[in-house]
């Protein structure tokens, strides 16, 4: 049998895009021989290493593409601070069943109660479990789409918000939205309706959403209809965690 040429094998592995196997096959072959492991065991170790590397890279890519401002986890959440929070409800959301059922998640509460933290943690968990995610704010969506419309590329820009398995819309209601902005946001909500879920954080209870959308009751009703038809609403009550030190003094 002609001896294997490592250079030729390395080139073939590069062409097949198998970096883990290329880097480790010689060392693992030596180790397998020393341990008298079978060829199948050796091959399984190589393939398992390649698969693990690819999965880790996929996770890193999904997290990078999600554009989280920071990374948060459920373990970091301060459960003791909010005056009212349904912990079992939130923990159940992290089973991620809402993605398969296209159920929206709406986190309602005043500023500084951890709504953004929970939305990021939920998105991060989705990334770890193989789902694409995009984190953005309501104002950023409107500004991006308005600029795209002026540049004649609105249809293409819509895909940024329609493609992810989970779209996180942070800070809905913190700033007023004019008629044009509300129409653009409605198109995103409408096109994701019963196709892919959204995670929305807001400081406004539903009965005050018309104040967000320039007191347009018709548009507000249409938005609420699509958001709430399949939705899990999380109510958080209390004082801002960012004011914790001042409050406790």
What label would you give each PLM region?
Residues 85-163, 212:
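Conserved P-loop
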Residues 1-11, 153, 246-249:
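Intrinsically disordered, low-complexity and often Lys/Arg-enriched segments
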Residues 53, 58-92, 100:
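Clamp-loader machinery-focused feature within the broader ASCE/P-loop NTPase space
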Residues 10, 18-70:
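Interdomain "pre-motor" coupling segment immediately N-terminal to P-loop NTPase/helicase cores
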Residues 7, 11-14, 23-26, 41-45, ...:
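Solvent-exposed alpha-helical segments within well-ordered globular domains of core cellular machineries
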Residues 15-19, 28-31, 49, 53, ...:
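Conserved, well-folded catalytic cores of nucleic-acid-processing
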